[in-house]
Amino acid sequence: MKINTLQSLINQQITQVGHGGQAGRLTETNPLTENSHQISTAEKAFANEVLEHVKNTALSRHDIACLLPRVSNLELKQGKAGEVIVTGLRTEQLSLSDAKLLLEAAMRQDTAADG
């Protein structure tokens, strides 16, 4: 899935739910009607799809500040210049707001590399 398509899906789900705290999904299931407390395969697929785009992305200080309450969900490393780099996920789901923030960071990095 292209990064722009994934960002559109995230924005649609945030609009549908009304906030970004809900775990993202790659299917059309309605998160408001799903009662399961287990992580669904759609949530796992969503997290893996986002990770595919954001792995090895350097985060800004603002990104880190926004992610701080949930930073334990991410695998991070320090780069050679002291930057914080996303290397993986420690959970099998990712909130819509975190996914949106991480994808925006990946887009900034891609734009800077192309520029």
Curated annotation (Swiss-Prot):
Annotated Pfam families: YopH_N
This protein's encoding gene: yscM
Q: What induces it?
A: At 37 degrees Celsius in the absence of calcium.
Q: Which InterPro entries match?
A: ProtTyrPase_YopH_N (IPR015103), ProtTyrPase_YopH_N_sf (IPR036484)
Q: Name one GO molecular function term.
A: protein tyrosine phosphatase activity
Q: Tell me the protein's name.
A: Yop proteins translocation protein M
Q: Where is the composition biased (Polar residues)?
A: 27-38
Q: Which organism is it from?
A: Yersinia pseudotuberculosis serotype I (strain IP32953)
> Which key words are in the record?
Plasmid, Virulence
Biological role: Belongs to an operon involved in the translocation of Yop proteins across the bacterial membranes or in the specific control of this function.
